[in-house]
Design a protein with these regions (language model features):
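Juxtamembrane extramembrane loops of integral membrane proteins
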Residues: 4-52
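Short, small/polar residue-rich loop motifs at catalytic or cofactor-binding pockets
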Residues: 5-9, 136, 190-193
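Short, glycine-anchored, charge-dense loop/turn motifs used at functional sites
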Residues: 6, 13-22, 178, 196-207
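Beta-lactam-recognizing serine transpeptidase/beta-lactamase-like catalytic domain environment
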Residues: 22, 144-155, 201-259, 263-495, ...
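Small/polar-residue-rich segments within soluble enzyme cores
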Residues: 42-49, 63-163, 491, 508-511
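Structured segments of extracytoplasmic/periplasmic soluble domains
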Residues: 46-54, 61, 82-90, 94, ...
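Conserved, well-ordered alpha-helix/loop/beta-strand core segments that scaffold catalytic motifs
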Residues: 68, 151-199
């Protein structure tokens, strides 16, 4: 018996509204069976013409004595049909599937793509491989001793079982809008790259995850750079491809800067070492163990209460809260908030937090961590942690996969994710929301203000290392409605040129996305 595999159709990946993000295209595999060939010259002539191949390459395979020789895979179906219609003995045209991405580069670093064998390589394609892959079928044909098929015995078929479909929380319209917004700010600010995350802070569903520049999923082995890549070695090329495929929202860490003051604020309020009415004085710096740590405003903010300190994003205020907490307590909240373990997002290669060891953390380290410097976290970790601090204190798992559907689209299994209740009290969570609403209404985040709806948020501008290079990461984290958040957005701009303040360049990006959500009346994201 001779066996030929029939590939199973891979399951589709769908967005929240059922739009197809990853699909299959029928392609053909052309093979020759040596023992059945009657007119080799005709076969060589037809195949070289139709497949646009060198006759010699085909001759080698046609003349090779073997049970079956593949000539070409991934042949367009129309070409396969033409070849089949010649009725050439010894030529087999088998139909097969190739992955196809209708939206090109949309959410490329989330969806991922498949290799030549149709197996997932990165992204959701590899994370949900077992669900999507299906089971191959086979064709068994009976042959005589010379390997010639005995026609009258026919063939036995085991039909392939198609893969199941994965429904995700991604929203194509939101993803497209956010990707355009990211491209726009990247071009305007001549930035190196821009990431945007949009998620539901109540349940962890991710609506959009943008990392520009993205790449074309239908052509994932072509670099997305303008530079001439002709002179690269194979290793350099592979390194650049790996870099292009990375998802910086979870594969890479960064120094968050002032968006991290939300964590210090929540810990200080929960522990009771600070209240909203506490007064602080900022002369433009704070002395910690004989070291002068500056405020962004060198002339100082003068006298202010805690809410004003947050509105001004004043470093000395948050250093003071960090020092009042002390290393042991600060570390306790770090653990309690889930910052020292990974978020568990359903994509491969999530990076962990890079933090000072507790025993190496002195007052100076504590002071810098309190306002978001001297350590690194992933954007997804920041978004998930802040979500958990503003939703009433429930630690959620950020995720894309929502349910697994049968290939015919029928019944599905809902995917479940862990959540941990009570990482802070409802009361502290409410105070954090109120303070962050003030930051947008009257403080450093006012460029995210929207008429008619309360938005909460926090800006950040951090210098990358070495500090002397004067390169910055500008970001803004916002959520709405402030009193009962249904959507949280994080925009991170790497290495912007010119004006680099997060409140000036990143806050308007989140505002434009929030306005887009509000204007799309058919979307009920923001109303519970």
């Amino acid at each position: 018996e001779r066996e030929r595999r029939i590939k199973a159709a891979r399951g589709q990946i769908l967005d929240a509204n059922g739009k197809v993000l990853a699909d299959n295209k029928t392609v053909c595999t052309i093979s020759v069976i040596h023992s059945q060939i009657k007119d080799p010259e005709k076969i060589i002539e037809v195949l070289s013409r139709e497949l646009d191949m060198e006759p010699d390459a085909i001759r080698k395979r046609v003349e090779k004595v073997s049970s079956i020789e593949k000539i070409k895979t991934n042949v367009e179906k129309s070409t396969g049909d033409v070849i089949r219609n010649y009725g050439l003995e010894g030529v087999k045209v088998d139909e097969d599937y190739r992955r196809y991405y209708p939206y090109g580069s949309l959410a490329s670093k989330v969806l991922g793509f498949t290799g030549a064998d149709n197996q997932g390589i990165i992204g959701l394609e590899v994370k949900y491989e077992e669900i999507l892959q299906g089971t191959s079928g086979k064709i068994l044909t009976t042959t005589d001793a010379r390997g010639v098929e005995i026609d009258q015995l026919g063939e036995k078929r085991e039909q392939p079982v198609p893969g199941k479909n994965l429904k995700t929380s991604l929203d194509v319209d939101l993803q497209e809008f956010a990707q355009q917004a990211a491209m726009k700010v990247m071009e305007e600010k001549q930035a190196k790259r821009v990431s945007i995350l949009l998620m539901n802070p109540q349940n962890g569903e991710i609506y959009a995850c943008v990392n520009v520049p993205e790449f074309d999923l239908n052509d994932p082995f072509t670099l997305n750079t303008e530079e001439n890549t002709g002179t690269l070695s194979e290793k350099q090329r592979q390194d650049l491809l790996n870099q292009m495929w990375r998802n910086p929202c979870l594969n890479d860490t960064y120094e968050p800067g002032s968006t991290f003051k939300i964590i210090t604020m929540a810990a200080g309020l929960e522990e009771g070492v600070v209240s909203v009415n506490d007064r602080f004085y900022c002369p433009g710096y704070k002395l910690v163990d004989d070291r002068r740590i500056h405020c962004a405003r060198r002339t100082g903010h003068g006298s202010q209460d805690f809410i004003q300190g947050a509105m001004n994003s004043c470093n000395p205020v948050f250093i003071e809260v960090g020092l009042r907490l002390g290393v042991d307590n600060y570390y306790k909240y770090f653990q309690q908030f889930g910052l020292l373990k990974k978020t568990g997002v359903d994509l491969p290669g999530e990076a962990g937090t890079i933090m000072h060891k507790k025993e190496n953390m002195g007052n100076v380290e504590l002071a810098t961590v309190a306002f978001g410097q001297s350590f690194q976290i992933t954007p997804i970790q920041l978004a998930a942690t802040v979500s958990s601090l503003i939703n009433g204190g429930r630690r959620i798992t950020p995720h894309f996969g929502v349910s697994v559907l049968e290939a015919d689209g029928s019944s599905g299994i809902k995917l479940e994710y862990p959540a941990e209740e009570g990482i802070i009290s409802e009361e502290t969570s409410k105070t954090v929301r109120q303070i962050l609403e003030k930051v947008v209404a009257e403080g450093s985040g006012r460029n995210a203000k929207i008429q008619g709806i309360a938005v909460g948020g926090k800006t950040a501008t951090s210098q990358t290392l070495p500090r002397s290079a004067n390169r910055y990461i500008s970001s803004f984290l916002g959520f709405m409605p402030a009193e009962n958040p249904q959507v949280l957005g994080l925009c991170i701009i790497h290495d912007p040129q010119g004006v680099y303040y997060g409140g000036t360049i990143a806050a308007p990006v989140i505002r434009s996305i929030f306005e887009n959500i509000l204007s799309a009346k058919n979307k009920n994201l923001w109303v519970d």
